[in-house]
């Protein structure tokens, strides 16, 4: 667990500096990273970010003012607002990832097989639902 804590600390520090280089807070940068996977409803975004809905509203308001995201009504329920990354939001997200040198350099020290194995292990530990 200690190694996981250290690795997450390095990643978070690297991410925070990279987001700051785009004049974003870590929370704003993380929101863009989540949206890079695809549009999300405001409620789902708050759950994913583990924050209060009012907090996510403020984050989205600031990102929207910068033209990085936009709100769109959901096709099946117009009361629901989905948040969508704009082309500029995609560019900024990619720029943040590109600036994460410490993380990228660490991962580059792994061969393809080791990277695939790390990805599979992380997915098994943090993403996959336990069978049952």
What are these regions (language model features)?
Residues 2, 30, 54, 116:
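Active-site phosphate/pyrophosphate-handling residues
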Residues 4, 8, 35-38:
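Short helix-to-turn junction characteristic of helix-turn-helix DNA-binding domains
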Residues 12, 61-126, 130:
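Charged, amphipathic alpha-helical coiled-coil/dimerization segments
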Residues 13-52:
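N-terminal helix-turn-helix DNA-binding core of bacterial DNA-binding proteins
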Residues 25, 57, 86:
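Ser/Thr-centric signal marking residues that sit
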Residues 32, 45, 60-66:
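Basic amphipathic alpha-helical segments that dock to polyanions
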Residues 42-43, 54, 61, 81:
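Residues within helix-turn-helix
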